[in-house]
Swiss-Prot record:
GO cellular component: cytoplasm; cytosol
Gene3D superfamilies: HAD superfamily/HAD-like
Family that this chain belongs to: Belongs to the HAD-like hydrolase superfamily. CbbY/CbbZ/Gph/YieH family.
Name of the protein described by the UniProt record: Glycerol-3-phosphate phosphatase
Co-factor note (free text): Binds 1 Mg(2+) ion per subunit.
S-S bridge residues: none
Catalytically driven reaction(s): O-phospho-L-tyrosyl-[protein] + H2O = L-tyrosyl-[protein] + phosphate; sn-glycerol 1-phosphate + H2O = glycerol + phosphate; sn-glycerol 3-phosphate + H2O = glycerol + phosphate
Subunit structure: Homodimer.
Top-level taxonomy: Eukaryota, Metazoa, Chordata, Craniata, Vertebrata
Length: 321
């Protein structure tokens, strides 16, 4: 997509050449990266991505990683970054660059349940999500497999519930089941029980162009069954950016958001007045961008990046020499 194709009064979605990248990097202090589909696919790093991030670190750029994936703790994500060659702090500071929805959901519940003695949450999610909640003092129940008990609805509804559950938290849960859905709805019949979703991604990119169903599918199921709307923590919700901003002291004018999804990464950047770069190694395509550019819907026009690259490795020439 050439610059002339961007249309409108403001030229956007420009290919980020090495020359433009040098100018852009001179204007920014902080780069925020999505992870899945940007830095890696599954357990395989995007070619050239580790070298690019190491070069950015060498130039003194501050890096942050904002991921909607709730299946790992901050520390586990930091370990993956180092294992795949992206570098990063070690020791007590390991994980401080990472802002995942597991960690930020824990911060959200700590705020919302402040003053509640011994707060407890029913978690449809991973042990990592439960661990982040436990780290801020929120007891977690429900993690792991849970099959249907009994022969029918009367038996399912007779299964005892944990007392004093004040929140239902829905993250990525490979053990999601009808039993869990039934329990979640029963907890949410209490009006003071919060419904929190880590993110609304409808699918998760893997290697070789494959995808699996994302957390958003599970959140929607609970919302529909409970007839409640979840508080969403992850991108494009501003809450996750506020978590980063509070810990990093970010100046939006000198910050770039780099991602592969228009409806999460780029929309978050647009909402928070950040510069945005779309990388084509993940979910969204230039055809998706063009559709948003040509739309009469102002909301869709927010999902148009300032720049795009085939891969974040395209930034490397601007960092060499």
């Amino acid at each position: 997509m050439a610059e002339a194709e961007a249309g409108g009064d403001e030229v956007r979605c420009v290919r980020l050449s090495a020359e433009r990248a040098k100018l852009l990097l001179a204007e920014v202090d902080t780069l925020l990266f999505d992870c899945d589909g940007v830095l890696w696919r599954g357990e395989t790093a995007v070619p050239g991505a580790p070298e690019t991030l190491r070069a950015l670190r060498a130039r003194g750029k501050r890096l942050g990683f904002i991921t909607n994936n709730s299946s790992k703790t901050r520390t586990a994500y930091a370990e993956k970054l180092r294992r795949l060659g992206f570098g990063g702090p070690m020791g007590p500071e390991a994980g401080l660059e990472v802002f995942g929805t597991a960690y930020c959901s824990a911060l959200y519940l700590r705020q919302r349940l402040a003053g509640v003695p011994d707060p407890k949450a029913y978690v449809l999610g991973s042990p990592a999500l439960a661990a982040e909640l436990e780290a801020v003092g929120v007891t977690s129940v429900g993690v792991g497999p849970d099959v249907l008990h009994g022969d029918g609805p009367s038996d399912w509804l007779a299964v005892p519930l944990e007392p004093d559950v004040r929140a239902v938290v829905v993250g990525f849960d490979p053990h999601f089941s009808y039993m869990k859905l039934t329990k979640a709805v029963r907890y949410l019949q209490q009006p003071d029980c919060l419904l929190v979703g880590t993110n609304m991604d409808n699918r998760l990119p893997l290697e070789n162009g494959r995808f699996i169903a994302g957390t958003g599918c599970l959140v929607r199921a609970v919302e529909m069954a409970a007839q409640r709307q979840a508080d969403i923590i992850g991108k494009p919700s501003r809450f996750i950016f506020d978590c980063v901003s509070q810990e990093y002291g970010i100046n939006p004018e000198r910050t770039v958001m780099v991602g592969d999804r228009l409806d999460t990464d780029i929309l978050l950047g647009s909402t928070c007045s950040l510069k945005t770069i779309l990388t084509l190694t993940g979910v969204s395509s230039l055809e998706d961008v063009k559709s948003n550019q040509e739309s009469d819907c102002m909301f869709k026009k927010k999902m148009v990046p300032d720049f795009y690259v085939d891969s974040i490795a395209d930034l490397l020439p601007a960092l060499q020499g």
